[in-house]
Amino acid sequence: MIQIAGITGNPDMKIQKRALVPMCADNGVVEEGVTQTGQEVTAIVAENFLSGDTSACVMSRQCGTKVIPVDIGMAVDTKVSKELKVAYGTANMTKGPAMTRAQAVQALEAGIEMVRRLKEEGYGLLATGEMGIGNTTTSSAVASVLLDRSV
């Protein structure tokens, strides 16, 4: 709290509303067989965020945090809000770019929009997360580029 008070310049800082915002999307690289489960698991877990049936939800409840999943790119539509959906999954990165530059910008802007909305709703502390089968493979690829290391 001391750090947050310092950042905000408010020594009487009180955080009344907190949210965890998992951004849910499917990864086209799954078609390469890089995962233990199928892509359909992304939608199942995303809907479980809504019903509170995930470990992230259990931990969030313990600290009074609301879980607000966002469909930013799942391959199918679910009960999760798709208002900010960029695409129905990404392309297979082994065959070409997973996303266009415009899609990448749109995805970043979707995150910015969620922060804006939640701030307007009075949320004082936000955490983000992700859910998408194949995400370890895509994260490894990003880390490889950023760290200039082979996978």
Set out the residue ranges of the language-model regions.
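N-terminal loops that bind phosphate or other acidic moieties
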Residues: 1-151
